[in-house]
Amino acid sequence: MSGKSGWPVVDNLHDNTSEKGSHVVFKRMMQAMGVGGPSVETVLANPNCRPGGYLEGHVQVMGGDHATDIEYVAIGLITRVEVESGDSEYSSDQEFHRQRLTGSFRLDPGARHEIPFRFDVPWETPITEVYGQHLHGMTMGLTTELEVARAVDKSDLDAVAVHPLPAQEQILDALLRLGFRFSRADVERGHVYGVQQQLPFYQEIEFYPPAAYAGGINQLELTFIPTPHTLQVVLEIDKRGGLFTEGHDAFGSFNVDYATADRTDWARELDTWLRQSAQRRGLFF
């Protein structure tokens, strides 16, 4: 067939076969990138907790525009950890406690699943709040992971506030009564010598000394390692050097029984130990 001009007539209708095929490939590629896939959101009943306590809430999983095979839903506590490597130091986010909430299941398009949970907080979890104020340098969050088969994982992160145990408050109160002031806190990878420790890191809370101790102490670092029955307390003192001597660190540790913690005058005990430490080479109590 030819047109009036003599040129062959070209059919303007496209062959949709290749176009449909390209669309399917593009759609699969977008699904693999997570576009149009499921979403996840965690709702905490209360973001405040204590070491050895728990967090409660639920995870909402919402289906996307296509059916999705979910491998599992899990939650975990994450914090920022300082790592020393040779002569360098860097920080990284580390998950230190994890709980799976589901096994595998198929999530239909537009479907909504609500998964309740009760998450145990490890005893050695670093504290992030003191007297209603955030501890400078600390980060803590509950991360939620939705593992998607053959696609990009989905996640959510919610801030968590970890408050001190009553026994920890006793020690903190004593230091503040002695005039020590909070400087900052961080979490360091490693283990503290001579204590029972499960997690691969420990928290250091740093204090400025008051005038009464400033002549012998540059800085005080406090570490708590709680267990179900006893609070392990570790002190590190950065001692000032003298006219003919160099400064150095002194260490000490002691245990606090939860049942009898409120029967001890910790301000008096700490004052005695701190003054003795400033006058001798080592500190062992």
Residue ranges and their predicted role:
Residues 2, 15-16:
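Short terminal hydrophobic/aromatic SLiMs and anchors at protein ends
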Residues 2-8:
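Extreme N-terminal basic, low-complexity initiation segments
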Residues 7, 13, 19-285:
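Terminal, compositionally biased non-globular sequences in eukaryotic proteins
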